[in-house]
């Protein structure tokens, strides 16, 4: 009955429901509740179906053709009222989501809408409950990171160079001042500045930056207004000192800016590339995706039946995402390679994929406004994620991650075999050079028995990623079956 009314797009009059042929369970329930006479009217707003209006009576004939003529005239008013109610409900739901959860990934927004609606219904009924837990079970994780190699060393070197230059400028003011008016205190201060410079020549220790800047701001710079009166040479040197300090914090920010700009260029380029490719991956199959930028770009993917509103999921899409991830990591490696000529600081990028075939559960942490691994058993995955980029090959001092390569870390033999099939295809497509390194890793705290495959990205071959991806789904079918 309802299906018929919606398909026809017309008001449907049922004179006597007990004589209606082939009644569905819904219609049987209506008869049992005493409904005999009935009108079902589809409601449309801007040509889109938004609901149905039902009028019922226990007496056959109460609703007839004449009634329906009058009803047709007011149906648009009902449609507008329902649309307004739906908009108001959606506004309240979005307000709850924004307050409780901040921005939500589109792939899982449906689950948050359900939870928000349920919470609003409880509040309306006078039940002051918290929003229900949001947990997704049976989820397959994928994790990848493009890490700037030795970023801490480069950052410290930049800070060190800026501090030395800052001290040299201060020492120049003191020496010219002493040359103009030989006050022993100026010579003593110049000596202490030199001591700080000598210390920085050896290493930059924790706290050195704050100590040196405090020394300059507290003991040296307050003298400058008085020293200017010593003569034009001193005044010009002081003006040059202040002109060099570009930072609002009153520090020299030259080499550090070159480093920060280089890191930002890498991050923004890789992140933009990843966003473009992720949009294509979402079109293949919906999944949860997140990325973070620090000294490089890391991203996580969660996929599984419980993330899909209708619960339809096939392992094909999991294998497809794993292959897609490997291909995209190749693209990120090439993006990083192309940037080298534009970087003010010569930075290298290493790439890693963490493989896990065992599904896990994720829970939304309302206090932290983010998803996290749920359950103590699943925490091993998080531990490995945090420590794997520093892993070394067993029996050597060599880091697993190397510039221009992709390392795939796994713990089960079947995981390694599956990725070798992906690698063979990607090598044939021209993304990778021939050959695979099979290595065993040193034990990490909380994670033992890890292995890795390491491959080298083809940087010089002119390959087009889209050409290979056009046949990706069919390729994955062959690999799976």
Question: Predicted segments — roles?
Answer:
Residues 145-286:
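Charged, long alpha-helical assembly modules
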Residues 85-183, 192-195, 250, 275, ...:
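Signal-transducing coiled-coil/dimerization helices and immediately adjacent hinge/linker segments
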Residues 233-481:
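Charge-dense, extended regions
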Residues 24-50:
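Helix-to-coil/beta transition segments that act as allosteric "coupling" elements at the rims
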Residues 62-83, 87-90:
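Amphipathic alpha-helical "output/dimerization" segments
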Residues 52-62:
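Short beta-strand-to-loop transition segments that serve as allosteric relay/switch motifs
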Residues 20, 24, 37, 49, ...:
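Conserved structured core elements
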Residues 1-27:
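Regulatory sensory and allosteric helical modules in signal-transduction proteins
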């Amino acid at each position: 009955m309802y299906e018929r009314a919606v398909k026809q797009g017309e008001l449907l009059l049922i004179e006597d429901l007990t004589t209606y042929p082939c009644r569905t369970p819904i219609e049987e329930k209506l008869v049992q509740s005493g409904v005999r006479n009935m009108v079902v009217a589809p409601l449309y707003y801007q040509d889109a179906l938004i609901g149905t209006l039902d009028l019922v009576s226990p007496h056959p004939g109460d609703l007839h053709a004449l009634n329906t003529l009058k009803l047709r005239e007011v149906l648009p008013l009902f449609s507008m009222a329902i649309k307004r109610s739906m908009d108001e409900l959606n506004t309240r739901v979005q307000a709850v989501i924004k307050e409780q959860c901040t921005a939500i990934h589109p792939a899982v927004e449906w689950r948050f809408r359900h939870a928000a609606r349920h919470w609003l219904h409880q509040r309306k009924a006078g039940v002051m409950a918290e929003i229900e837990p949001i947990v997704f079970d049976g989820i397959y994780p994928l994790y990848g990171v493009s890490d700037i190699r030795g970023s801490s060393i480069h950052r410290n070197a930049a800070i060190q160079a800026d501090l030395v230059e800052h001290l040299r400028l201060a020492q120049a003011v003191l020496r010219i001042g002493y040359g103009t008016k030989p006050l022993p205190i100026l010579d003593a201060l110049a000596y202490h500045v030199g001591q700080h410079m000598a210390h920085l020549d050896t290493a930059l220790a924790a706290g050195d930056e704050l100590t040196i800047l405090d020394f300059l701001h507290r003991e040296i710079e307050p003298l400058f207004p008085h020293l200017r009166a010593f003569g034009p040479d001193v005044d010009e040197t002081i003006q040059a000192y202040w002109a060099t300090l570009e930072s609002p914090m009153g520090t020299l920010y030259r080499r550090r800016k070159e480093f920060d700009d280089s890191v930002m260029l890498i991050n923004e380029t890789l992140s933009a590339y990843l966003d473009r490719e992720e949009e294509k991956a979402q079109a293949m199959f919906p999944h949860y995706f997140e990325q973070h930028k620090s000294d490089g770009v890391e991203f996580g993917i969660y996929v599984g039946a419980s993330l899909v509103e209708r619960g339809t999921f096939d392992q094909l899409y999991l294998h497809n995402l794993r292959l897609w991830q490997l291909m995209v990591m190749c693209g990120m490696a090439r993006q990083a390679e192309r940037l080298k000529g534009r970087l003010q600081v010569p930075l290298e990028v290493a790439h890693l994929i963490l493989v896990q075939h065992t599904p896990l559960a994720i829970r939304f942490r309302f206090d932290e406004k983010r998803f996290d691994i749920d359950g103590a058993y699943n925490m091993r995955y998080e531990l490995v994620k945090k420590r794997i980029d520093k892993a070394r090959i067993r029996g050597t001092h060599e880091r697993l991650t190397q510039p221009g390569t992709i390392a795939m870390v796994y713990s089960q033999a079947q995981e390694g075999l599956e990725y070798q099939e992906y690698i063979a295809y990607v090598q044939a497509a021209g993304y990778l050079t021939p050959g695979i390194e099979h290595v065993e890793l040193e034990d990490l705290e909380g994670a033992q028995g890890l292995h890795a495959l390491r491959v080298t990205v083809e940087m010089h071959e002119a390959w087009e990623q889209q050409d290979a991806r056009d046949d990706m789904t069919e390729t994955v079918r062959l690999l799976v079956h």
